[in-house]
């Protein structure tokens, strides 16, 4: 299954409701409980400068792009066992597509 085309505005709402308590997206944004996500696409797991990642995140070694985020966001702890991300995931494919569309827009 490919990544469904997402709606940026719906994705922004999901980010605000489910992600913003732990993540920022703007350039130069601070790390919170989770890393700042600016420049996420094309970056390898565990590589945001200045954030203390688990060894599991550093060792995963994949590059964040639409398909890897789509799989990760469904069940983060299954995709990266040992991650400290406590988010249970987004089970609905369309919600993951919306969030990815927003992240692509907001983290450039």
From Swiss-Prot:
This protein's GO CC annotations: mitochondrial intermembrane space
Subcellular location: Mitochondrion intermembrane space
Domain of life the protein comes from: Eukaryota
Swiss-Prot/TrEMBL keywords: Electron transport, Heme, Iron, Metal-binding, Mitochondrion, Respiratory chain, Transport
Keyword Transmembrane helix belongs to the record: no
Post-translational modification remark: Binds 1 heme c group covalently per subunit.
Gene Ontology terms for molecular function: electron transfer activity; heme binding; metal ion binding
Binding site for heme c: 19, 22-23, 85
Listed InterPro entries: Cyt_c-like_dom (IPR009056), Cyt_c-like_dom_sf (IPR036909), Cyt_c_1A/1B (IPR002327)
Gene3D superfamilies, per the entry: Cytochrome c-like domain (1.10.760.10)
Function noted in UniProt: Electron carrier protein. The oxidized form of the cytochrome c heme group can accept an electron from the heme group of the cytochrome c1 subunit of cytochrome reductase. Cytochrome c then transfers this electron to the cytochrome oxidase complex, the final protein carrier in the mitochondrial electron-transport chain.
Protein family per UniProt: Belongs to the cytochrome c family.
Protein name (Swiss-Prot/TrEMBL): Cytochrome c
